[in-house]
Amino acid sequence: KDVKDWDRIRPLDGTRGEYAVVLESQRILMEMLEEHVPFLQTLFSPATTLAKMCSPAVLVRHMREDPARVHRVLEMVTDTTIQFARASVDMGADGFFYASQLSGRQTMEKTEYEAFVEKYDLAILNAVKDRTWFNVLHLHGAQVRIDEVQHYPVQGLSWHDRDDGPSMEEVRKYSTKAFVGGLSWGENWLTKTEEQVVGEVREMCGRPGLILGPGCVIEPHTPKKFLELVHKTVVERSCCR
């Protein structure tokens, strides 16, 4: 994982290869829908993409060791991501679930975040904001910089509010954006009892500006009963609509 390894990265077409597979999956899914529901395609931030090629720690080390090399690759990934995003919108996407896995305060200094993460986030989000109507920024991890991203051109915010914080009450003090969350996510979700699942939903009921959902992903092997309980509780309480 030498910093010079980044020189091996070359530009990619955002509509070919694995991107083409995702776009075809989107096409098939949208054809299967019997009625129109808002469709958000997933995008990963360029810094997140680079971190997946090595690790967050290695990426930060390389940022500090040779920033010009890392910026060169971030620019390429940004261009590719914009190509993919525009193609997704052309196929009917209403917006994006834009995921950043390097938004934790413990990952890097604020000035580094602004130069290596925020700069490229804004380039992508600004490229699609006029062609979409609902975009969600997902900040993955603990101690996220949620107070520092309120200027991002997105309508919704998603983070591990229940599992890692900060709480929705705290963020609502300074944010007018819609919140997506309120439920535990991943393995944490699997440890819940049925009573705890119902309790999480009831706690969120009646809150303005909330789209009820997990703090991140739902495990594929989540018991169907849990999902049914969420729906049943929402309907019974006539909330979160």
Task: Give the positions of each predicted feature.
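Active-site loop segments of alpha/beta catalytic cores
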Residues: 13-241
